[in-house]
């Protein structure tokens, strides 16, 4: 399997679990509070690593207790942290509410993620992956690093509207949901993976639609990151895009059956069993 390089965010997820999501101005009583490693970039890196990919991560943490915890978590999944920097800003935090039906609301406090820099090229990289939770220069630098060595360049253009559509169009593959693809308009890369939640995903413009795998959903927070990590792991194996997407969908179907993001990412034997 080829190497996957991920340039992205890393946060401490602070998740509160509630019966339902609150209305504006409403106070609800929650059932439990969980601290867990998160951040779109780190989540996707962990998802790929647990599927057997050789992963190198580029990001920035604060010089604080959360930073120590998150660095140790990434190292525990065998991820190369040679591109992980420290800065004086606090480590990023995501405040998450999760309802009993699995739906969620998320507020991200970027902190040190606003200091992520353009990554250095890696001659062994087969796939580069980035997202919209880091500065524009880091996203542009990820594309440049991929182009320098002929690697595939993949962008998860989330959250919506954070990246110029013209920049997204220069990547080989974009992973977007229905809101994010609307924000891009007609500026699309050659291949777009359109995620459709419980309906699965579709390869735009001319690829197949693939159904979601059956799952007992309890928390959808990490579903998109699981899909992205599974997808790039498949691409690093040399799979065609549709086959890589199937791997991503299987990864997501297992993730939503567990609480949290990184702790919920499945192993390769689990994903292979789901696909069998």
Task: Show the residue positions of the predicted features.
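Hydrophobic anchor at the start of a short beta-strand
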Residues: 4, 54-55, 81-82, 153, ...
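Conserved beta-alpha-beta core of the PfkB/ribokinase-like small-molecule kinase fold
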Residues: 126-191, 198-201
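Conserved N-terminal subdomain of the carbohydrate kinase-like
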Residues: 24-28, 32-35, 50-127, 272-276
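Short gly/ser/thr-rich secondary-structure transition/capping motifs
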Residues: 78, 110-116, 153-160, 210-212
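Conserved phosphate-binding/catalytic region of the ribokinase-like
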Residues: 1-4, 186-276
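Glycine-rich phosphate/adenosyl-contacting loop at the front of the ribokinase-like
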Residues: 1-58, 67-68, 261
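Anion (oxyanion) recognition and catalysis
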Residues: 49, 75, 144-148
């Amino acid at each position: 399997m080829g190497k996957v390089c991920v340039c992205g965010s890393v946060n401490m997820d602070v998740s509160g679990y509630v019966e339902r999501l609150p209305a504006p101005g409403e106070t609800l009583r929650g059932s439990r509070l969980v601290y867990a490693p998160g951040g779109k970039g780190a989540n996707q890196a962990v998802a790929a690593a647990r599927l057997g990919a050789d992963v190198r991560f580029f990001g920035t943490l604060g010089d604080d207790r959360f930073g120590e915890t998150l660095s140790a978590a990434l190292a525990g999944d065998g991820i190369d942290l040679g591109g992980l920097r420290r800065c004086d800003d606090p480590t990023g935090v995501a405040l998450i509410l999760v309802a009993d039906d699995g739906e969620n609301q998320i507020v991200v406090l970027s902190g040190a993620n606003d200091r992520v820099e353009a990554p250095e090229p890696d001659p062994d990289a087969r796939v580069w992956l980035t997202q919209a939770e880091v500065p524009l220069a880091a996203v542009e630098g990820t594309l440049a690093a991929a182009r320098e060595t002929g690697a595939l360049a993949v962008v998860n253009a989330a959250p919506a509207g954070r990246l110029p559509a013209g920049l997204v169009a220069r990547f080989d593959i974009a992973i977007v949901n229905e809101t994010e693809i609307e924000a891009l308009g007609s500026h699309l890369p050659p291949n777009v993976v359109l995620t459709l939640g419980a309906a699965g995903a579709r390869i735009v413009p001319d690829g197949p639609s693939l159904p979601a795998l059956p799952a007992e959903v309890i928390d959808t927070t990490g579903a998109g990151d699981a899909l992205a990590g599974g997808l790039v792991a498949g691409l690093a194996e040399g799979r065609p895009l549709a086959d890589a997407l199937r791997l991503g969908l299987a990864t997501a179907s297992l993730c939503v059956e567990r609480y949290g993001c990184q702790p919920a990412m499945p192993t390769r034997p689990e994903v292979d069993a789901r696909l069998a």
